[in-house]
Amino acid sequence: MVFVNPLANALTSIYNNEMRRNKQAIIMPASKLVINVLRVMQKEGYVGEFEYIDDGRWGKITVQLLGRVNKCGPITPRYPLSYRQMIALPDYVRRYLPSKEIGIIIVSTSKGVMSHKEAARLRIGGVALGYVY
C-alpha cells in the first residue's frame, strides 16, 4: 500500500472516526510530523492521549478521541504564512475556519509545529499544514 501524504491520511482518519463516534482512531503510517500535529491538537483540546506503537514496519499511532472535532483536514498546497498574514487572516485562512475565534490552523515554523494563534503571538511565520475546528 502506498501512502503519499501521511498527514492527510492521519487527519482524514481522525475525522472519519469522529463522524462514526468511535472512541479511538488508529493512524498509520506514523511520522514525526503527525506526532507533532497530534501534540498541537492535544494541547488545544481536540484529541486526548495518543500512543506510538512500533509494529516493525512503519508504526502506528492510537489516538483517544474526545468528540470535539467537527472538521479537520490538510491544507494543500501548503501555503507559506507570514506573521502579518496570520494576524490579518487572509482569504485562504477564512476559507478553512468557520470563525476568527473558532478553530486553529496548524503551522510548521522554525520553532516547531504550533497553532496559528501561538505563532502570531510569538511573531513568527511558517507553512500551513492543516486545520481543525
Curated annotation (Swiss-Prot):
Annotated signal peptide: none
GO biological process: translation
Swiss-Prot/TrEMBL keywords: Ribonucleoprotein, Ribosomal protein, RNA-binding, rRNA-binding
The keyword Chloroplast is assigned to this record: no
GO CC annotation: cytosolic small ribosomal subunit
GO molecular function term, any single one: rRNA binding
InterPro entries to which the protein is assigned, alphabetical: Ribosomal_uS8 (IPR000630), Ribosomal_uS8_CS (IPR047863), Ribosomal_uS8_sf (IPR035987)
One Pfam family cited in the UniProt record for this chain: Ribosomal_S8
Superkingdom per UniProt: Archaea
Bilayer-spanning residue ranges: none
Function: One of the primary rRNA binding proteins, it binds directly to 16S rRNA central domain where it helps coordinate assembly of the platform of the 30S subunit.
Family of this protein: Belongs to the universal ribosomal protein uS8 family.
Subunit structure: Part of the 30S ribosomal subunit.
Name listed for the protein in its UniProt record: Small ribosomal subunit protein uS8
Organism: Saccharolobus solfataricus (strain ATCC 35092 / DSM 1617 / JCM 11322 / P2) (Sulfolobus solfataricus)
